[in-house]
UniProtKB/Swiss-Prot annotation:
Upper classification of the organism: Bacteria, Pseudomonadati, Pseudomonadota, Gammaproteobacteria, Pseudomonadales
NCBIfam families: PRK02813.1
Name by which UniProt lists this protein: Probable M18 family aminopeptidase 2
Regions annotated as coiled coil: none
GO BP: proteolysis
Family matches, as SUPFAM superfamilies: Aminopeptidase/glucanase lid domain, Zn-dependent exopeptidases
Annotated Gene Ontology cellular component terms: cytoplasm
Annotated signal peptide: none
Co-factor requirement: Zn(2+)
Length: 429
């Protein structure tokens, strides 16, 4: 099971360079398992035992398994994660031609660790909107090949580089794509038109706009002398998306189960398809149209917000509270913050710990040092919007928000096992 899950995760990461592609990858796997698309613009005709999914903006998705047991009596088991990761996004008018090179202007998306983006073989992927035969259409593209690089400045020209280096995103991050002749002018949108023709065999009249991200072409991989680790891009938080999906597909219970994977978590979640938007609430309201039934059902439900946790790094152990240092390959982490940066409380933490104990899955706790600030997740946002009880958990990770992150190769199986047990649980606290 562990090897199959790790192989599946690596394939999922490769197929998901952007939130759009991650959502498409989730859709592909859900449809293969018999899930049917619900269009938000249509009226819905759902049935007990049905399996459905809803997407918004092509970058967020909610999968729903309507159980035979009444959600009003038994509640809904929900798992939440997010599809986006910090990266470099291409600007609307990006062409820069300097010193005989074609570069593209980029905007930093989210709280990225910038130094690791230098000297990497980069490709480009995302969504392109174009006009064809008088109609406005959109399509996902992925160049796949390494088409760009951000070369470092040689240490001979930057002698203090190893003493600390403040990176200027405006000046130092535009990737190089090609050499150009002195008076040659490159139209980036024309390049996108060519890519649409190559990848999808369609001829666009004009590219109208796009949402494109650079990404590292190096595939995720099992590494370490004993294969103890998985290194790869976008583990935060596609690792949790994949774990939630596998648990949902494995859960053969009669309970109603939901998996929600939102976009825009890394930039605050405040969007139509983010956790701070109405997508999940509106979906549940359509499934439970009576207001009284909706409130009663939500109060009987529970959300597991799954987002990576900070593992204790052997070179920087002092960055953790001495009693709360999550270790890789030691199981999922219950995340606690009394200032409500995490939504965990004693009841929800206790229930998750109970599930781990019943499944013989190791479990850990994380609390940030008292002299450091704490990050957050979709957990508190979802809890405040729905009023649903929530526990924040995640798998320990090194190098979070780097272009290449690291997690334990045993932990994915741990998380899938306990999330499957959660989906199958007959009673919630």
């Amino acid at each position: 099971m562990r090897d199959a899950l790790n192989t599946g995760l690596i394939e999922f990461l490769k197929a998901s360079p952007t939130p759009f592609h991650a959502t498409a990858s989730l859709v592909q796997r859900l449809e293969a398992a018999g899930y049917k698309r619900l269009d938000e613009r249509d009226s819905w005709d759902t049935e007990t035992g049905g399996r459905y999914y809803v997407t918004r903006n092509d970058s967020s998705i909610i999968a729903i398994k309507l159980g035979k047991q009444s959600p009003l009596l038994n509640g809904i088991r929900m798992v939440g994660a997010h599809t986006d990761s910090p990266c470099l996004r291409v600007k609307p008018q990006p062409e820069l031609q300097r010193q005989g090179f074609l570069q593209l202007g980029v905007e930093v998306y989210g709280g990225a660790l910038l130094a690791p983006w230098f000297d990497r073989d980069l490709s480009l992927a995302g969504r392109v909107t174009y006009r064809r035969d008088g109609k406005v259409e959109s399509q996902l593209i992925d160049f796949k090949l390494p088409v760009a690089i951000i070369p470092n400045l040689a240490i001979h020209l930057n002698r203090t580089a190893n003493e600390g280096w403040a990176i200027n995103p405006q000046n130092e991050l535009p990737p190089i794509l090609a050499q150009v002749a002195g008076d040659e002018r490159i139209d980036f949108r024309a390049l996108l038109t060519e890519q649409l023709a190559r990848e999808h065999e369609l001829i666009a009249d004009v590219v109208l706009d796009y949402e494109l991200s650079f990404y590292d072409t190096q595939d995720a991989a099992l590494i370490g002398l004993n294969g103890d680790f998985i290194a790869g891009a976008r583990l935060d938080n596609l690792l949790s998306c994949y774990a939630g999906l596998q648990a949902l597909l494995a859960a053969d219970s009669d309970e109603t189960c939901v998996l929600v994977c939102n976009d825009h978590e890394e930039v605050g979640s405040c969007s139509a398809c983010g956790a701070d938007g109405p997508m999940l609430e509106q979906t549940l309201q359509r499934l439970l149209p009576d207001g009284d039934t909706y409130v009663r059902t939500v109060q009987r439900s529970l959300m597991v917000s799954a987002d990576n946790a900070h593992g204790v790094h052997p070179n920087y152990a002092d960055k953790h509270d001495g009693n709360h240092g999550p270790k890789l390959n030691a199981g999922p982490v219950i995340k606690v913050n009394n200032n409500q940066r995490y939504a965990t409380n004693s009841e929800t933490a206790g229930f998750f710990r109970h599930l781990c104990m019943a499944e013989e899955v190791p479990v850990q706790s994380f609390v940030v040092r008292s002299d450091m600030g704490c990050g957050s997740t979709i957990g508190p946002i979802t809890a405040s919007h729905l009023g649903v009880r929530t526990v924040d958990i995640g798998l320990p990770t090194f190098a979070m928000h780097s272009i290449r992150e690291l997690c334990g190769s045993h932990d994915l199986a741990h998380l899938v096992k306990v999330l499957t047990a959660f989906y199958r649980s007959r009673e919630l606290p």
